[in-house]
């Protein structure tokens, strides 16, 4: 006999909705030739001068993934690398004028995907959901814990 569940399967609910939201985001951004990672790099590089390493951390990307992402942005003429004025070893990701235009469009797309998901809920439920998720993300579930077998996780923020 299977054990009796005493709580809703929060892991499934969060994983499933997150996965579906990511697929919708990928499809929507794909229409303008971007990935979610490319969007993340463009938007955060426009906020302030940031190094490739800083942007990788914000986007939860390893070095290889970040290099591939920036290579794609360079190839598309949306961003470039330039030396840091304060650290010879670091590279600043500089967004081009075309990249800034694409970033504004991609942010509209991202906002639209989020708006569409939230619009499927009544106003009162939407506000409660967002407050609860924000409380979890900045409180009890803010940081992962060490584990002998690392949990695979999706890219964060961005």
Please tell me what each predicted stretch does:
Residues 16, 51, 87-89:
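A conserved beta-turn-beta hairpin within the catalytic core of GNAT-like acetyltransferases
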